[in-house]
C-alpha cells in the first residue's frame, strides 16, 4: 500500500471524536489558529505534512498519535507496529513527539465521565465565559480555553488540580504521575538539579479559597476541628415523610380544592431510602401524614437518645407554600417549627451534630424563567443575592449545625415528573451516590445539584427551578460510604 493510500485508509476509519483527540494532541505542532479550518482527518494529515511531522519515510508521529488514542488496530494492521514496540520506543528519552503534558490532559479527558465534566464546567464559570462552557463543549475544548487564559500550562497545573480535587479526587493520580515523571526526566537531563518548590501548597490554598470565606490564606488539614464526625453505624435516623394522597385536603379546605395528588413521589422515597441506606443511615418512612402527625413524629424523635449517632436527617415530600409544608389534611406545618424541634436545648443528644432537612415542596405559585447571565458581576446581582439569602432567615433556628436543602427558592414552584420523581430529589440522590465515595463534602454536592436542576426546563411553560441550600454548619460535612 502506497503512502497516500495508507493515510486515506486510516482517515476513513477515524470518527469525529477521534479527530478532535488528534487535533488536541497535535497542538504543540499545529497551533490552534491553524487548526480552525481542519474539519476532517485528511486535512489534518495535510497540515502535518506541511509541518514536516508526517513523511513517507517517517511515520513515527502518526504511530504515536494512533497509540495514544488507543487505535491499536490501525497501528498494527496498517502501519505494521505493535503496541509493545510503541511502549518500548516511547520510553527512550527524547523519542516522544507528543508532550507528556498533552498526553496527560488527553488521558484525563478519557477518565472523566459526564457528571464530572458538568461539575468541571460549573467550577470554571468565573474563569471562562459561559458561551464556552456549553453542553456540547468537550473537556479537550475546555482545556484549550484554559490555556488561552493562561490558567493551564505545562508549568501551571494549580487550577486543574484544585478543580479535580473537588470533582473527583481519583483524577489527581494521573496528574501526580505526570508531575513525578516530569521531575525525573528533568533531573536526568539536568544532572540532578535541585527540584523547584512544589506547587502543592499553592493548590491547597486555592482549594481552601474555593471552600471557605474570602481572605483565608492558609489551608487547614481535615481533622475533628473542621470536619463533623461521621463514624457511627448507623450514622443516625433518616426520616422520610412521603405525602401523596391529598383527597382530605380537597374535601375539607375550599382554597385547596384543586390540590392534586403527588404522582411520582414514590420514586423519590425509593431513591432517598436507597441512597441514605447505602450511606449507613437507619431509614424510617411515613406515608400520607397530616400536619399534626408530622409534628408528633418529630417530637417523638426529639426525645430519643441520639448519643450513639453522629447525624440526623429528615426528608419531607409534600405540597407547600411560603415557609410551610402541607399535611395531607391541608393543614400547614411551619418549616421553622419543624426544624426547631432539634435545637441544642430541645434535643441535647444532637447538640454539636449536623441536623439536615431536605424539603421537596413548592414555596409559592410563581414560575421561574430563564434569564441571560451577564459575564460580569454587578451591584444588581449582589443585591439579588443578598435578598435571596435573607429571605430564608426564619426557616431554620438561629443556631449552629443545621442544613436545610430546599427544592426551590421562596415564592416559586418546583417540578415533579409522575414517571420519574422530582427534579430536585432525583438529582440530589444521584449526586450523593456518585460524589460521596469521591470524598466530596455536602455543600460541594449541593452546589452541583443546583447546577444540574437549574439547567432543566419545563417543556410546557419553559419554567426553571433553582434549589436553595440554607445552613449554619460550622464544619465540613462528609458522608463516607464505609
Swiss-Prot record:
Q: Does the keyword Phosphoprotein apply?
A: yes
Enzyme Commission number, as recorded: 3.4.22.61
* Record comment: activity regulation: CASP8 activity is restricted by RIPK1.
Statement: the UniProt record of this protein carries the keyword Membrane = no
| Compartment(s) of residence | Cytoplasm; Nucleus
Q: How is it modified after translation?
A: Generation of the subunits requires association with the death-inducing signaling complex (DISC), whereas additional processing is likely due to the autocatalytic activity of the activated protease. GZMB and CASP10 can be involved in these processing events.
Q: Which branch of life, at top level?
A: Eukaryota
The record's Gene Ontology cellular component field reads: CD95 death-inducing signaling complex; cell body; cytoplasm; cytosol; death-inducing signaling complex; lamellipodium; Noc1p-Noc2p complex; nucleus
Task: Name one matching Pfam family.
Answer: Peptidase_C14
Record GO biological process: angiogenesis; apoptotic process; apoptotic signaling pathway; cellular response to mechanical stimulus; execution phase of apoptosis; extrinsic apoptotic signaling pathway; extrinsic apoptotic signaling pathway via death domain receptors; heart development
Modified sites of kind Phosphotyrosine = 336
Q: According to its UniProt record, where is this protein mainly located?
A: cytoplasm
| A Gene Ontology molecular function term of the record | endopeptidase activity
Site Cleavage: which residues? 218-219, 376-377, 388-389
Stated role: Thiol protease that plays a key role in programmed cell death by acting as a molecular switch for apoptosis, necroptosis and pyroptosis, and is required to prevent tissue damage during embryonic development and adulthood. Initiator protease that induces extrinsic apoptosis by mediating cleavage and activation of effector caspases responsible for FAS/CD95-mediated and TNFRSF1A-induced cell death. Cleaves and activates effector caspases CASP3, CASP4, CASP6, CASP7, CASP9 and CASP10. Binding to the adapter molecule FADD recruits it to either receptor FAS/CD95 or TNFRSF1A.
Summarize subunit and interaction data from the UniProt record for this chain: Heterotetramer that consists of two anti-parallel arranged heterodimers, each one formed by a 18 kDa (p18) and a 10 kDa (p10) subunit. Component of the death-induced signaling complex (DISC) composed of cell surface receptor FAS/CD95 or TNFRSF1A, adapter protein FADD and the CASP8 protease; recruitment of CASP8 to the complex is required for processing of CASP8 into the p18 and p10 subunits. Component of the AIM2 PANoptosome complex, a multiprotein complex that drives inflammatory cell death (PANoptosis). Interacts with CFLAR and PEA15.
Q: What is this protein called?
A: Caspase-8
Source species: Rattus norvegicus
